């Protein structure tokens, strides 16, 4: 299957990767050839949006997690584990995301054995959810070890094993 080379105006480069890499090399990566899977997932997400779209703004954080965010993560191929204590007992995050049910089950075993660090080390990402359209930079009113939602995810990642390199902050619309 031939692959189209992306045009620089089809994306916003935040300089995580060079434009040359994105324009000339990324399309040669086998994993990048995922158009059919992407279309299938997009249609699944579109159907979910048709079912939930008029409700999401009224959901509190837990409802949004259950009715929207969890469903989006599942459609994207993630399995999840809820409210896992950070290693060292520095709080807990909303979800750990795993690339397979087997890795999630292995993480549950680690968690039950009191090895939170092992559970976090098996995760693909941690996820912190807020209400729909939450301002991630708005200062929290109460005294916490982190000042806002963006800093909260950074704080969590700093207290997890190096194997876990990704944190996702979402209010359902912005990820």
Placement of each model-derived feature along the sequence:
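A short, conserved, highly charged catalytic patch centered on acidic carboxylates
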Residues: 1-166
